[in-house]
Each structure stands twice: as C-alpha cells, then as structure tokens.
Amino acid sequence: MVRKLKFHEQKLLKQVDFLNWEVTDHNLHELRVLRRYRLQRREEYTRYNQLSRAVRELARRLRDLPERDPFRVRASAALLDKLYAMGLVPTRGSLELCDSVSASSFCRRRLPTLLLKLRMAQHLQAAVAFVEQGHVRVGPDVVTDPAFLVTRSMEDFVTWVDSSKIKRHVLEYNEERDDFDLDA
C-alpha cells in the first residue's frame, strides 16, 4: 500500500504530465558527444555548442550581405582563414562550409582526440590519462588540460615529453633509444 502524498508533493506532481511528455533528442545527442569524446564536464559541450552557433550565425549574416560588398569579402576571407587554421573546416572554399561547424568539430580538435588520430594512444580514455598525467607536450609547453584545442599549425608539434617513460618505451620498442638523450 502506498502512503498518501504530502501537500507539497501533490503540488509538484500537478506540474508534471506523465501521459503527454515530450521526448527531446538534444539530451541524447549531448550524451553521445560527451561519451564519444570523453568530455569531463557538460559545460565544455555547451561552450562548444555556443561557439559553433556563433560561427554559423556570423556566416549567415555575412551571406545576407551583397556579394560585391568589400566588407563581406574581407570578413568572409578572415572567418574562413581562422576556421581553417583552427581545423574546423576542411578547406577555405566558401561560407557554406561554416554551416557544418558543430560542437563535434571542436571536440575533434581536442588534444586527446588528436593523440588518437596521430596513433600515440590506442583509446581515447588512455589519451586523456596521458594528457592529464603530463606525458604530452605541444611545442615546448607541457599540456595537462584535455580540453586544449590544437590548431593545424601546432598539430605537427604534438610529441611526448622528453622525461616521459612512455617515450622511453616507444623508443626502446623501435630500437631508437639513445642513452645520452634520455638521461636529462
């Protein structure tokens, strides 16, 4: 037997319709992206979503301007150059490419995802652990934040830290280890 509901519980239940509730797909898509790219906080996803929405909105406003407008030409070129340099669009072709920018585009440029792409890690979970533990550097700087976005120009400079045991094991496996270099 079920107990009688208290007054405040009845008031709360009046606000909920258990028979006709809407299913929103946004939450499911959000959870898929969070799980697929191993995002640690939901705020990261919402931030990427806001940025992608702003890019799409800016591209739409630029497309609404007349085609011969010098401001449109300059701003479109600057926007496409910026997005291409960040790695969010594949080419500098046209403003139509800006419509494909999404939160997943930003997630694909995160450091752990690029470690997976560069075959420095087998799984995304391991890549996140390598970054958090300080085994990876981008250029001269050691990066410990998995949310670090890597641009196209910095993609070539993603390597292991010199003092990393993982680098030592990789070099030993490939028979390229030099005792003089690694004793630093």
Curated annotation (Swiss-Prot):
InterPro entries, alphabetically? Ribosomal_uS4 (IPR022801), Ribosomal_uS4_N (IPR001912), S4_RNA-bd (IPR002942), S4_RNA-bd_sf (IPR036986)
Q: What Gene Ontology terms for biological process does this UniProt record contain?
A: ribosomal small subunit biogenesis; rRNA processing
- Swiss-Prot/TrEMBL keywords: Nucleus, Ribonucleoprotein, Ribosome biogenesis, RNA-binding, rRNA processing, rRNA-binding
Known Pfam families for this protein? Ribosomal_S4 (PF00163), S4 (PF01479)
- Subcellular location(s) of the protein: Nucleus, Nucleolus
Q: Which domain of life is it from?
A: Eukaryota
Q: Which GO terms describe its molecular function?
A: rRNA binding
User: A single GO CC term, please?
Assistant: preribosome
User: What region holds the S4 RNA-binding domain?
Assistant: 109-175
Q: Which CDD domains match?
A: S4 (cd00165)
Q: Does the keyword Nucleus apply?
A: yes
Family, per entry: Belongs to the universal ribosomal protein uS4 family.
What does the record note on quaternary structure?
Part of the small subunit (SSU) processome, composed of more than 70 proteins and the RNA chaperone small nucleolar RNA (snoRNA) U3. Component of a heterotrimeric complex containing IMP3, IMP4 and MPHOSPH10. Interacts with MPHOSPH10.
Biological role: Component of the 60-80S U3 small nucleolar ribonucleoprotein (U3 snoRNP). Required for the early cleavages during pre-18S ribosomal RNA processing. Part of the small subunit (SSU) processome, first precursor of the small eukaryotic ribosomal subunit. During the assembly of the SSU processome in the nucleolus, many ribosome biogenesis factors, an RNA chaperone and ribosomal proteins associate with the nascent pre-rRNA and work in concert to generate RNA folding, modifications, rearrangements and cleavage as well as targeted degradation of pre-ribosomal RNA by the RNA exosome.
Q: What is this protein called?
A: U3 small nucleolar ribonucleoprotein protein IMP3
Q: Which organism is it from?
A: Mus musculus
**Source species taxonomy:** Eukaryota, Metazoa, Chordata, Craniata, Vertebrata
